């Protein structure tokens, strides 16, 4: 749709003042905060520090991912981001319910190749697609870790994601950890929005499921 038609429709529905504020905010997110928060890399010094950190308990985190007709580039990016974590005691449980045979063969081949290189990766082909909730449960059934982490098949983790989660577990006895998230327009360099999650509030949670991904419990 033409951008001007979209703006006109937005003005009609919400008014000029709200529309102007929305445009300014989106530009601020995209062109300033997007550049500030987007980098998915860390310095070698930070990486060494995080990799050498020794928690009181070296807890295994099981990252569960339901796959469904996942694009190859998204799958590779997700897989690489998990393998690039500075905290290494994790396992990746992939439950594939794809109904396109060509896509499923591609995912299975990539997963098996990754398994040969990294024994922390587990893959299972599901015969029935039961929807994202039950497919996630099938991935959870594969897990052996003390904590479960929910991740989508088109998500990307920052290299420090599990390290930061472990900080919350180790120093604050966190039982349920949820994180801020960035939305991308196809590639990580194009930030669409940044979701800064609030502190836990039952009242807010009843109207807005703000925990979602990345969540660990």
Where are these regions (language model features)?
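Conserved donor NDP-sugar-binding/catalytic core segment of glycosyltransferases
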Residues: 160-191
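The conserved acidic donor/metal-binding loop of glycosyltransferases
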Residues: 152-156, 180
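N-proximal low-complexity "stem/linker" segments adjacent to membrane-targeting elements
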Residues: 9-81
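Glycine-rich, basic loop-to-helix element that forms the pyrophosphate-binding segment
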Residues: 126-143
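Short alpha-helix within the catalytic core of nucleotide-sugar-dependent glycosyltransferases
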Residues: 79-80, 137, 145, 158-171
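Acidic donor-binding segment of Leloir-type glycosyltransferases
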Residues: 83-128
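Short aromatic/hydrophobic "clamp" motif used to bind/position activated sugar donors
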Residues: 148
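A recurrent flexible, glycine/aromatic-enriched loop bordering the glycosyltransferase active site
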Residues: 133, 141, 190-217
């Amino acid at each position: 749709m033409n951008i001007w038609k979209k703006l006109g429709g937005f003005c009609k529905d919400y008014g000029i003042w709200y529309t102007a504020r929305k445009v300014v905010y989106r530009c601020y997110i995209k062109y300033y905060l997007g550049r500030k928060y987007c980098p998915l890399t860390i310095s070698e010094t930070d990486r060494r520090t995080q990799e050498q950190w020794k928690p009181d308990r070296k807890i295994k985190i099981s990252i569960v991912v339901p796959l469904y007709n996942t694009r190859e580039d998204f799958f590779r990016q997700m897989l690489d981001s998990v393998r690039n974590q500075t905290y290494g005691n994790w396992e990746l449980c992939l439950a594939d319910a794809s109904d396109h045979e060509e896509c499923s063969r591609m995912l299975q081949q990539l997963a098996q190749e990754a398994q040969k290189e990294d024994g922390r990766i587990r893959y299972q082909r599901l015969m029935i697609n039961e929807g994202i909730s039950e497919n996630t449960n099938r991935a959870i059934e594969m897990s052996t870790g003390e904590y479960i982490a929910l991740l989508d098949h088109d998500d990307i983790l920052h290299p420090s994601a599990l390290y930061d989660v472990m900080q919350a577990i180790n120093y604050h006895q966190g039982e349920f950890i949820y994180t801020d998230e960035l939305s991308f327009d196809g590639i990580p360099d194009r930030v669409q929005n940044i979701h800064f999650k609030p502190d836990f509030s039952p009242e807010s949670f009843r109207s807005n499921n703000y925990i979602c991904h990345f969540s660990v419990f």
